[in-house]
């Protein structure tokens, strides 16, 4: 199924432009509040481990979480991270909140990663401009698509293994027949002599 056109953007330490703002590092105990915010735009829930294992920052107005950004993936081995889950409550858009929380997440990630990337819908110029303000630049454009699986998830991988195991079993049986002295099609007769 066709999906939205997306823009992959990236930044490294030399191009990153910090955005001064008062933001807060989110803690796993705040997952309920974060998920309530995300329900306004994503309709998905994150487990508390997403915050514990990732980097999430939020912005509050009168104690209420109104903007947040976090991570999809952090690879310390590849020194690469992917920012995601950026959302600002509809009533607070256009005030730089998404830039602030994305900037805080990016700054922390660039302490241990050489590059940080993110994906954004091509039809979202305010978000693209916010990321450019932080030093992100366009790397590629692509189309996101939904893929429908036609069979069990591992069928393509397990079918060859099943064939190899069946062949192995057949070869072991044939080998046993030869060891017992029966080469007449796999029948064993322990009392027969050549």
Give the residues covered by each predicted segment.
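Conserved active-site alpha-helix within GNAT-family acetyltransferase domains
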Residues: 1, 99, 122-140
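Acyl-donor-binding surface of acyltransferase catalytic domains
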Residues: 1-20
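A short beta-loop-alpha structural element at the N-terminal edge
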Residues: 22-33
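A conserved beta-strand-loop-helix scaffold within acyl/acetyltransferase catalytic domains
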Residues: 45-56, 60-87
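Conserved acetyl-CoA-binding loop-helix of GNAT-fold acetyltransferases
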Residues: 88, 94-110, 128-133
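Conserved GNAT acetyl-CoA-binding A-motif
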Residues: 109-119
């Amino acid at each position: 199924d066709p999906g939205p056109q997306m823009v992959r953007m990236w930044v490294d330490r030399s191009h990153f432009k910090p955005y001064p703002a008062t933001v807060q590092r989110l803690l796993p105990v705040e997952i309920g509040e974060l998920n309530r915010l995300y329900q306004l735009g994503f309709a998905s829930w994150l487990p508390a481990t997403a915050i514990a294992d990732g980097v999430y920052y939020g912005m509050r107005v009168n104690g209420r979480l109104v903007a947040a950004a976090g991570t999809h993936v952090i690879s310390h081995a590849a020194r690469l991270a992917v920012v995601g889950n950026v959302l600002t409550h509809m009533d607070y858009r256009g005030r730089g909140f998404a830039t602030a929380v994305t900037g805080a997440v990016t700054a922390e990630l660039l302490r241990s990663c050489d590059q940080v990337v993110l994906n954004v819908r091509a039809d979202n110029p305010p978000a693209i401009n916010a990321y450019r303000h932080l030093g992100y630049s366009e790397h590629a454009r692509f189309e996101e698509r939904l893929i429908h699986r036609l069979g069990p998830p591992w069928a393509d991988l397990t079918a060859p293994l099943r064939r190899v195991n069946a062949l192995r079993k057949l070869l072991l049986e044939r080998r046993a027949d030869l060891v017992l002295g029966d080469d007449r099609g796999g029948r064993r007769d322990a009392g027969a002599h050549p």
